Amino acid sequence: MAASSWRGAVLLRTVSGLWQAGPDAAREWMTRLPSLLGFQQRCVSCVAGPAFSGPRLASASRPNGQNSALDCFLGLSQPDNSLPFRVPAVSVHRDEQDLLLVHRPDMPENPRVLRVVLLGAPNAGKSTLSNQLLGRKVFPVSKKVHTTRSQALGVITEKETQVILLDTPGLISPAKQKRHHLELSLLEDPWKSMESADLVVVLVDVSDKWTRNQLSPQVLRCLTQFSQVPSILVMNKVDCLKQKSVLLELTAALTEGVVNGKKLKTKQALRSRPDTHCPSPAAQGPNPQPVRDPQQMGWPHFQEIFMLSALSQEDVKTLKQYLLAQARPGPWEFHSEVLTSQTPEEICANMIREKLLEYLPEEVPYNVQQKTVVWDEGPSGELVIEQKLLVSKESHMKILIGPKGYLIAQIAQEVGRDLMNIFLCEVQLRLSVKLLK
């Protein structure tokens, strides 16, 4: 069949299928037909295991007129939400994704850019926050530590501004990396990211009462070594706190009582305003021989403090607008259609791994090897993926398959939904479990 006829047939089929999943999903897909490189997404709904209800596409927007809880805290006016922000999809074809990554950026006349590093302890919520800021789930998320195994890159492009998010693994010590035989990338990637950062977002999970009262030694060491890089503090998961007054105490502890170069009084801890910046010692230039006080628990050089719940997206949009406002004049690094630097195969493998971490107990998910054996286009234009999950113990195999194959089918179904929202295409995902010999 000729390419034009084939694409026309698939277009009719897929738009019809997507409309069943929801008119919003269909409209979003239709807006992506014209593309800079002449590529067209060739599929639209997702089939993975049993039938499922239509997905809800992630969105960074909120209803017009909805006030932010941080208005008084940060003094930020509400952005104009009259025009919806369109989030790019990721191509299902690796060569198309690679070509787009190296394509000349379609910059406006006065481009602005900002490279942001998300820093924090393992499982602080960095990937969840990155997904919410991007408006589409492209990074794996789970409650288990070390879900992010290496640095991942996401791109926000709005109007003249491009913000590049570097989602790094949680900072760990060399001793922990060696003791648990973790990949070297878990140790090195956060430090490498800091070398090109324009802004550091330090994320603290305030729902963890064991760690919330101080920054981890690894985070403090990183901030000290790169003290010339501006930083802000994001206190995450505040919705989990029953007593909001605890936030005042945590603010004082994590900032050592200083924000934006000014000492805070208890009643002033939640009144930092972005229009009253004062240069902090950290902004004066790099410290050639950074020395960290071993008794130090917080960082006194944060420019701003944000309190939010990344999971419910409460006030995430306010943080996003702040990041866009911090961008500096400079050339874009990517075309506006780039959402992430990950290949489609990497995204798929990460999403499957996310579900393994979520549903499998203890050490089981960490001992599963993944091998993609099929990544092809089906007869109707759908994306067909087949991945083998290799385990070394028969007991692990039984756990992964589940009673009557229910668990492996559920994983395939849920991953399929995620992949549809990422690729905006029909996906047939087949998972099989094999015992290593």
Swiss-Prot record:
Q: Where is this protein localized, as stated in its record?
A: Mitochondrion matrix; Mitochondrion inner membrane
**Is Magnesium found in the keyword set?**
no
What segment(s) does the record annotate as region G1? 120-127
GO BP terms: namely: ribosomal small subunit assembly
> Residue ranges of region Disordered?
264-296
Q: Which domain of life is it from?
A: Eukaryota
Outline the extent of the KH type-2 domain. 360-437
Region G3, residue ranges: 167-170
Which residues, renumbered to this chain, carry the PTM Phosphoserine? Answer: 173
Quick one: which residues bind GTP? Answer: 120-127, 167-171, 236-239
Alphabetically, the GO molecular function entries are: GTP binding; ribosomal small subunit binding; rRNA binding
> Where is the transit peptide, renumbered to this chain?
1-43
Cellular-component GO terms for this entry: mitochondrial inner membrane; mitochondrial matrix
User: Which key words are in the record?
Assistant: GTP-binding, Membrane, Mitochondrion, Mitochondrion inner membrane, Nucleotide-binding, Phosphoprotein, Ribosome biogenesis, RNA-binding, rRNA-binding, Transit peptide
UniProt-annotated stretches for the region G2: 146-150
Q: Where is this region: G5?
A: 308-310
Which family is this sequence assigned to?
A: Belongs to the TRAFAC class TrmE-Era-EngA-EngB-Septin-like GTPase superfamily. Era GTPase family.
User: What is the documented function of this protein?
Assistant: Probable GTPase that plays a role in the mitochondrial ribosomal small subunit assembly. Specifically binds the 12S mitochondrial rRNA (12S mt-rRNA) to a 33 nucleotide section delineating the 3' terminal stem-loop region. May act as a chaperone that protects the 12S mt-rRNA on the 28S mitoribosomal subunit during ribosomal small subunit assembly.
Cross-referenced HAMAP family = GTPase_Era
Designated name of the protein = GTPase Era, mitochondrial
User: From which organism does this entry originate?
Assistant: Bos taurus (Bovine)
- UniProt lists the gene as ERAL1
